[in-house]
Amino acid sequence: MQKLLFVFSVLLTVVLATAPFQVQCPSSPLIREAKHELCPEETLYLKKKKIKTKNKLIQFLKSLTEAKFSSKFYKRVLKDPPKIGIAISGGGYRSMLVGTGFISQMNDYGLFEYSDYIAGLSGGSWILMDLVVQNFEVKSLLQEWDLEEDLLLGIPEFDISEEEIVTNAKKEYNDNDLKMKKRQGGSLITSSSNFYEQIEEIMNSIEEIPEDYMITKRNLNPLARLKKIFFPNNTFTGTDAKIETFKKVLDFYKSLHLKIKPKKMEGFQISFTDYWGKAIVQRLKKNFDDDPNHSFSFSKLVNSSKKFKECSVPIPIFVANCKNGLLSNVIFEFTPFEFGSWENILRLFVKLPYLGSKIVSGKAEKCINNFDDLGFITATSSSIFNNVLIFIWNLASQSSREAMKALNMVMGIFGLGKEEIFSISKDSSRLETDYAVYQPNPFYLYPEKDNVLTNKNHLYLVDGGEDGENIPLRTLVIPERELDVIFVLDSSSDIDNYPNGSKLKRIFEKLDEENVHYQFPNNVKTFTHPIVIGCNATKRTGHDSFLPIIIYHANANHGNASNTSTFKITYNQSEVSSMLPTGRGVFSNDYDLYYKNCLGCILTKRTMDRLPRKKKFSPFCLQCFKDYCYS
């Protein structure tokens, strides 16, 4: 027992080093009202980056032997270089692996470091975390990931589309009796009878709930079907081995609890997303949580990166959705500089290092650092996996009396014990911990902003793709960023785990409501090649700048099938080796030399559009626009 307490004490000392802590508040305001400008730090970074990387584009253009650009053309581009963004969709490891190949090919062309922004959500956000961990060295991506170990220990692989997960997410519970039954399903099982019989009883109680009443995102359906995977024949053979496996699973989740505890001890609300964040970080071979001298703060990691300090890499942007009230498709973003939203309902930002501070009416009362944990932010953007964690907690906490007591004791410390999870609270102020909880809300009671984002002292954030907006495009399209071209990689699972363009269409419909008009290519049957949208020099409504050109790339079979399930949580080396070339093929159009040359025309089109003279493009570029631009 003493040895166990000693180990616990040592581990707790280590993880406390990464917990949020109080600091002295700065004299300058922490909240910025976003009127029509970027924050000063972002503006300065882009100004320095333009000087640092503009020659990379010239090098790429000079490598294009068919386009034959002139020296006069190069001078124009150097004088007014295009601004480029990258948007990586969700899709679990599928998105991360295809996306890694995608930006690796960009890097080979010299276009990755030239780009100004890279935005990711859900599985795409894992690429951003990897980039930050690897000091933005594209060639080092995936080296720290242990892809052969289960991402969530104890959960088998299954194939459910993101669309199926979020289909009924907006439904509300109206039947309290049914709700009570759902939450109490199996929760009173505490006897020491056969362990697997208890699990079976729990699963049966879950399946008794009428299908029409189930909320797929926020309860155990469709995860109840995993019973068939755990127990395909309804038989429980090899009990000793299974109990040993379960102990391993339990140890895994206990370790997550231990790493989350310091945040709770500092008085912060804990949610399932905290555990999910630690689970993601544990899949890194170098466990940063075990290094007492290493902060995993997003702002600190990025701003200590050599390449980022040199202003030679794109700014990473994590995207999440807000669920306060009945909001939908209200997006928030995390950059290394600030956190907030460009949505008209808010347009406020807080300096990222001070996220977690108590700020009321725009004035700082207690300042915190280290709340911006990179794992937590990544998990927030990819919290569609929360339902998997909910499943494992229900499975584990209803096991044998000994295991249940051990787990319930640890969970109770965080306010996530059996009683809290399975009971109906009459306290309306109680927070929904299956969302990512950001409390204190930095925008609480902000003057002249009385709405659901400011009248509560918490923000609920969820997977960036939960409302069907699975591509982080809108955060890049805003006029303040003045982008000319956006590379989009869509690895959504619309049909057979391949995208069909529906996510892009949904975003265009949302943009249309904001007077930002793109025409969706309805006459395109398949999305196996890049499609260039918005080539025509269309100016924004109410602005003097042009809308950015969107180069849409869809994950497709480029010699290797890449339609693995979003919830496939292990990949062996052979599988990884087959996915990465797909991403390269998607970006390069299967290494098509003509397309590569045309890319030079497309990337510089807005630069030429801004020239006053009408005759601007070479015959070669005009043919490229005809071949690839959708109008």
From Swiss-Prot:
Residues 24-631 form the PLA2c domain. Residues 1-17 form the signal peptide. InterPro entries: Acyl_Trfase/lysoPLipase, LysoPLipase_cat_dom. The keyword Transmembrane helix applies. Glycans are attached at N233, N293, N303, N500, N536, N560, N563, N572. Regulates spindle pole duplication in meiosis I, but not in mitosis. Required for meiosis I, meiosis II chromosome segregation and spore formation. Binds phosphatidylinositol (4)P mono- and polyphosphates. PANTHER family: CYTOSOLIC PHOSPHOLIPASE A2, MEIOTIC PHOSPHOLIPASE SPO1-RELATED. Belongs to the lysophospholipase family. This is Putative meiotic phospholipase SPO1.
